[in-house]
Amino acid sequence: TFYSERYLTTLRLRQLHNLLAGIAYEHLIILANTDTYGGGGIYNSYTLTTARHPMFSPVVVHEFGHSFAALADEYGYDEYTPEYTPETEPWEQNITTLKDLSVKWGNQLPANVKIPTPVTSKNKKKIGLYEGGGNQTKNVYRAYQDCRMRTNTAQEFCPVCQRALKRLIQFYVTEGPAAE
């Protein structure tokens, strides 16, 4: 899909929903019976990943971040056509173009944060403005050096992604915005 051998989607979503008619569900996780690496997460729709690849577990968690909480990829490609411009703030909660950081993790940044925040061992567990995210290497920033939305080796979601997940769960549980 989208000219990527590892990006999985389904062209039969309507058929899938018809098959599930009458069954109560909140979120779909589709497992493909293959050992080929890949996955995809469509916000508010489904997670799809391969079930027999050795990296299955971290990939399904990453794709769930997309499909459940609308989290963006936190990695970039040099050859990628820019999707995000400095004039527009991305709607995903874990990336920014610095257009309007106040609505995201701006209140969690240390005073005098460097832009971009250097990727160093000293900053490993610090919230900052690290360049690279939304499939772009430039002009898009993420909050943490490493996160489940960046690599398969990260053990957990970063604090900003965790907050986005908690806010969404709280919204559904309390039928309103989450308290901070």
Protein language model annotation of sequence segments:
Residues 1-79:
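Active-site-proximal segment of zinc-dependent metalloprotease catalytic domains
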